[in-house]
Amino acid sequence: MSETVAPFLLGTRGLHRDLDAFVVATRFDRSGKAAAFALGDGSVHLVAIADTANWRKLEVHGGAALALSPDTSPRCFISGGDDGKLRRIGGNDAVSDIADFRSKWVEHVASHPGDKGKGLIAAGVGKLVYLFDQNGQKLKELPHPSAVTGLAFDTKGKRIGASHYNGATLWFVAAKTDSPRKLEWKGSHTAFAVHPDGDAVVTAMQENALHGWRLSDGQHMRMSGYPAKTQSLSFTRNGKWLASSGADAMVLWPFFGGGPMGKAPIELAGGDGIICTQVAAHPQHEMVAGGFADGLVVLADINTSRILPVAPPEHGAISALAWSPDGTQLAFGTEQGFAAIIDLSKRE
């Protein structure tokens, strides 16, 4: 990795806790005023940004937490677990059921705030995606040919997509008669991302590669060369770059000037032979955060390749990474249960 003399931000601008269980996911609520960490022991830890000394532990799932998302409303979260529960965590720390799928795992959750009270919640359970309104009333079930492995709404909330074996499927959420668009490519697809302008989707594949489809003309996009499986995908705010894990650097593919076909990606913060496990593009600027298998966390400027060290390689492999909506806070968690929030807001 590029050498730098700057101190790690964890020591100068961070607050952390040892939570004693694998950090499955971390997210900020839509207001950006609170962060949540979902753990492998079924608990969810909440932290108000205005009071980061106070970490609240909630017992949310009877088994492991498997998925976490901000809710449709500003101050709540949605979680899924291997106890079959899809649950809402309220701004007052109250936990309530949206749905109970009993013995079936809720492995993927997503939400969209919608307009004028028309927010949507989605849960991936086996081969089905369940769609709920913001009040938790079930709207429809969307079937897939195999287990859902990734789930995301597009930017406008008009479509939802899921990855699965042999491809991905896109659905219009408001369609009275569901006629999904099926995107086919043989193999095991394990993660899913939608381009910010809605014209492309990308999946990670079991065979250490990415596959994409340009929706306007069906053009396939193949992105390969990874030494490990890609677990994390993140488009930059304007969709110019797709950041990905799975190599000993953050790998960014160009999605401008016709897309990534025939073009080499750029690699940031690489060279040490340690696999990048998580990426998170900044929501406002051309920057990307990356977490590595040795616990290192860095922030990279895409245009200059300048690297800012966030956390040293001391606390276990990075398993979760997320920005607040305004990009002033960065949260991360590790397989060893270490969790932290970095304050990047301007200081007087």
Q: Language-model segments: which ranges?
A:
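WD40-repeat beta-propeller superdomains and closely related acidic/aromatic-rich repeat-like regions
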Residues: 1-348
